[in-house]
Amino acid sequence: LVGSEMCIRDRYDLVIIGSGPAGLSAAVYAKRACLDVVVLEKEPMGGGQMIYTQEVDNYLGLPETNGFDLAQKFEQHAKALEVPFISDEVDNVEKNTDGTWKITGASGTVYETKTVLLATGAGHRKLGVPGEETLAGAGVSYCATCDGAFFRNKTVAVVGGGDVALEDALYLAAGCEKVYLIHRRQELRGTKVLQEQVANEPKITFLPDTVVKEICGEQMVDHLVIANTGTGEEKELPVSGIFIAVGMNPQTDAVASVLDLDHGYVRAGEDGVTEQPGLFVAGDVRTKKLRQIVTAVADGANSVTCLLYTSDAAD
């Protein structure tokens, strides 16, 4: 995602923070409603977590696609409507005395706007063990589809027990010599279909009741220190890479001072309305039961529609 060379408005109707499926959907609806809108995105490429999804087979009308391609289609749609994008990370969101909003970017730019839509999604949760930070990008990865090709014919580990971890293990097994699937519990949490596929893949070895204590290597990962959660027994596990898939953390630091968060998530219904008038939310960052591409897209549409009827953004 390349930041546009453009003049910053004195005041926007709507600033959308994040260009995942929720943010892009909202941008399309806002532009079609003739709002003066801009999308802020901190990552080099938009699309949110969707770009890391190897296969998307439940998005209506596109039974055989992947998250990266779908994200590109979403972004192309928004750009075809001339939605402006700016590459900037949001440090703070605060309310002005007149009820409008001020957004401060890491670039130092201040964006004034009548309304805000938070669509920042969630980021990768970390293990918090020695070696994770120092070896990031040197064998430590959070995206199998991004980095898996670097480990062809090598032995790797995947940490986690949910759908993402199982999908990562299966994806890596196609090119790696061996894949260890490490989970802190006895039973996996992923869907039964994925569990069966993992069980039937000879290259995958499941290590239940196991945690990673340390990620080791001089310049690149060469082994892990793992421990049994029951006995506490530790041992070394030789691997060339580790793929961490232990969940997500909502990206809400920028609004923590203006919203009462629920375990980091923004409290809101499908209309995206928060406790703060003029501040809306959409996608995985809000409290909800189902976090998928289709629900994020719906959130974006719903929040902008509600915004049009409940705020002065269109005035």
Enumerate the language-model features and the residues they cover.
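Beta1-alpha1 glycine-rich phosphate/pyrophosphate-binding loop at the start
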Residues: 12-81, 155, 160, 166-192
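Glycine/Thr-rich phosphate-binding loops of Rossmann-like dinucleotide-binding domains
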Residues: 47-48, 113, 126-127, 166-167, ...
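A Rossmann-like FAD-binding core segment of flavoenzymes
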Residues: 78-105, 110-113, 174-270, 311
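FAD-site-proximal beta/loop scaffold in flavoenzymes
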Residues: 4, 123, 128, 133-150, ...
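Predominantly flavin-linked oxidoreductase catalytic cores and closely associated redox partners
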Residues: 109-112, 119-200, 206
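Conserved small/polar residues in nucleotide/adenosyl-binding loops
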Residues: 1-10, 309-315
